[in-house]
Amino acid sequence: DYPCDAYIHSIQNGIDYSGIHHCLITHIHADHLYPSDFEYLRSGFCKLPEDYEGFHLYGSVDVEAKVAKIAERTNGKLVFHCIKPFEPFFIGEMKVTALKALHGTPNPYIYLIEKNGTALLYAHDTDIFPEETWDYLRKCGVTLRAASLDCTGGVHEDLEYTGHMCV
């Protein structure tokens, strides 16, 4: 995800974003997608190497609606890939599958990411998975090495917060 506070995260954690070229977006809330920052990929705002391959965003049609016009203005520096749930695709050597989530936006995703026989389930900002997602996970034959799960409100024993697991 690329949240509204991405810049401060880069400063606080010493992350050089110039080496990051791909980003999976889970959903369109501003704490996960802040498209205004991508305006700075336009000519006149930043100096990029001549061979810059672009910053690739992957997400649902909801994400596309938020970033399409910005991407057009960046002359190929922001590249959007509209992905569908349960249809694996590759980013380099990583196999990525968007899975349906439940989170109060029309098409939220969580991601199953596989590389060299290792798998990660990235499942933030989702309630208990929809049945289609459970079915896919049961049938796909992947053994997870790690899972990163939603923990919003996890310290509150009796919190009911639709769109979050609260674990």
Give the positions of each predicted feature:
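Active-site metal-binding loops of divalent metal-dependent hydrolases
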Residues: 1-5, 28, 62, 101-103, ...
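Pre-active-site segment of Zn-dependent metallo-hydrolases
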Residues: 1-24, 28, 35-47, 129-139
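Conserved beta-strand hairpin/beta-sheet module of binuclear metal-dependent hydrolase folds
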Residues: 1-13, 107-125
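Histidine-centered divalent metal-coordination motifs
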Residues: 22, 26-32, 103, 161-164
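Residue-level marker for buried hydrophobic side chains located in beta-strands
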Residues: 24, 120-122, 147
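Metallo-beta-lactamase
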Residues: 49-108, 115-116
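A short secondary-structure junction signal
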Residues: 68-71, 106-111, 123, 132-135, ...
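Cap/insert and terminal regions of metallo-dependent hydrolase folds
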Residues: 128-167
